[in-house]
């Protein structure tokens, strides 16, 4: 996935009100940017961090700049939670996930469950449909181990329960974690940060929901899904 225009670099001053960040650009300008991320961005908001932003002069936008990448632990980390669905779709279409290869059709944002929309729906006539729920991952606190979630996510637990219902109806329920950073070799659920989600994940796997984790390579030009990483056994569940 390529960024449509070159990114602009700067230094993060602060993130606040969840969706805003103050940034000093490399040319000295001080700007306020939108932050397309509803999570805590734990470990990614230190003042002075190198950041990269996209720019749009569309008249309907209140803020022309959008935060896309933060440098943390000498690694570029994608923070735009609007991108993982596109990254996941590209990963599936290029055969990165063998168990999801070969479906005839791929549809986005299809209604299902309890007033929800599935991120990706794969269909192929006689084969069971595959309902793919995509989650963005950028949290690392142990070297090499990417974790989800970085804060409590009741919505995430609801999605797991809906995937269980999908499996019970004879379809495939897929949990696909897109890790927007390259410095991970494995993935795990952070049960200490959200025990309820961790237990929901455990129940979902026991009920037949499938889970995959994908690592990405991040540059100032774009984000590319590169390979699967193993998912560790449940850990730190209280």
Curated annotation (Swiss-Prot):
Q: Which GO terms describe its molecular function?
A: DNA binding
Q: Which InterPro entries match?
A: SfsA (IPR005224), SfsA_C (IPR040452), SfsA_N (IPR041465)
Q: Which Gene3D superfamilies match?
A: 2.40.50.580, 3.40.1350.60
Which domain of life does the protein's organism represent?
Answer: Bacteria
Family membership noted in the UniProt record: Belongs to the SfsA family.
UniProt-listed PANTHER family: SUGAR FERMENTATION STIMULATION PROTEIN A (PTHR30545:SF2)
Mind telling me what this protein is named? Answer: Sugar fermentation stimulation protein homolog
